[in-house]
Amino acid sequence: MNLFFTKNHIVFEFDETTGVSRLIEGEYFRIEQMLSTDYETKVRVNKKELLNCIDRATLLIRESDKKPIIIQIEDGEMRLKLTSGVGSMNEEIVIEKEGKDILIGFNPKFMIDALRVIDDEMVTLYLVNPKAPCFIRDEKESYIYLILPVNFSSASV
């Protein structure tokens, strides 16, 4: 395989195939700084229950819609809400919570992508605030998934 770089592109050549991709402009996220061990809220939740709930929510949104799933964590409960032109959903899941209550929004597809590849029965989410990334990781740190939150209007809640 051959690799070629220009100022704005990268070119991959292998066998009789050539691929071209545009390079990202600007600075990329500094992942090391984002992977903090500090958190305000730690949540343990049944992975299958959370995944099924988010999966059901995606039935209410079209691919072109950028509707976030709103997650409200209070006491021993996680409320998941989504409202779209098709309908709305509001579900509750029992959780183990350590730390502060939080209200945060995520692109449901990104959350589903992370949860689908985790083999554990229970997952642990670490949250700092509604504008900081969420981490899903196990105790041994054999995996870490970073999911960026999305902004949402208070009218969506």
Language model: regions and residue ranges:
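DNA polymerase processivity clamps
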Residues: 1-24, 39-157
